[in-house]
Amino acid sequence: KDIWGIGLKNEKKLLKVGIKSGFDFIRLPDNWVKRNMSIIGLKLKKELEGIPTLDIVEENNNKKSIATTRSFEAEISSLDDLIERITTFAVVASKKLRTQNSECNMISVYIRSNPFKENNEKYHFSLTGALPFSTNSSIEISKFAIELLKNIYHKGKSYKKAGIILMGLTPESIHQVSFFEKDTKKHKKLMESIDNIDNKYGLYKVRLASQDQKRIWKMNRQNLSRNYTTNIEEVLLVS
């Protein structure tokens, strides 16, 4: 119950075998966790053990939800820095949505403290919101995610991890037009153009205005091929 992200279904499984705390959880065999809680549960266990998994984690659970989460290299207390991270997570998750030709109508955002820091207050804040219309636009999803973040951010507290979860996934082919959406067609064409650029030149060649250009560049440099530009100024900006 003291671990964020376990979920009610897995919590019941753990309670049945006498697991009641994070300490109990990390003592379970890896193969049991993977068999009963999937690879997602195993990644959570490794994280609690202090063993790093992927820097940015994208998860797709039977097309019911898509999550992008990350533990930061250092604690963050600035709202602006958190906005930059959440925006990047939204972009990554949105691209995954488009790849599987889906849209979402609900978003959840969370931020939490460092669970391994001794003598430190443990806290996490999360908020889920329903979208006024289904979308897979990076622009729309990041905008709504930032609003959720602003509602759970507590000034003066430090955060070590954050994440965004896209839920209420539906096929893009059955999109229902809403009174509240104005730029769907324009966004669809823009997202198609961005995805084409990403597929041709590599990820993060086009970024949103609220993303940090130097950080994106640093994240992607180790994966560059000789065909990629080496000029940071060539990264396109979408505002």
Residue positions per predicted region:
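Hydrophobic/aromatic side chains embedded in well-ordered alpha-helices
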Residues: 1-2, 196
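DNA-contacting surface of Y-family translesion DNA polymerases
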Residues: 2, 10-156
